[in-house]
A protein has these predicted regions:
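A short, Lys/Arg-rich alpha-helix, primarily the initiator
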Residues: 1-39
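DNA major-groove recognition helix of helix-turn-helix
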Residues: 53-56, 69, 85-88
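Recognition helix of helix-turn-helix/homeodomain-like DNA-binding domains
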Residues: 37-65
Length: 103
């Protein structure tokens, strides 16, 4: 990822925020994945969630988050997707402003 690739950083910050909030609510990874994609087999859903959170096996990069999946994540947490996006955006801005000060 480019040093200042804001959209990519935003997406990763959104995923990190969702992951953190799911953990705070006590959801296990597979349980949360099943909430996001209930029509999928649990193992398939868990693999997809892992690919979004970490890295996909074929590419070595995290899978991108679709708008539909972002809405599913927010709904599963009982939160507004716009609110989560604002928090993620601010987290990236803070990290970038902190990085600028360190250099």
């Amino acid at each position: 990822m480019e040093k200042n690739d804001f959209p990519q950083m935003f997406e990763r910050a959104f995923v990190a925020l969702v992951t953190e909030r799911a953990a705070v609510r006590g959801y296990k990874k597979g349980e949360f994945a099943a909430m996001l994609w209930p029509w999928m087999k649990p193992k398939v859903a868990a693999t997809r969630w892992n690919a979004i959170r970490d890295k996909a096996i074929p590419t070595g990069k995290p899978q991108s988050v679709t708008i539909a999946d972002a809405l599913r994540m927010a709904d599963a947490l009982g939160e507004d997707v716009g609110y989560l996006m604002v928090i993620a955006k601010e987290n990236v801005r803070k990290s970038l402003s902190g990085a600028d000060k360190k250099e």
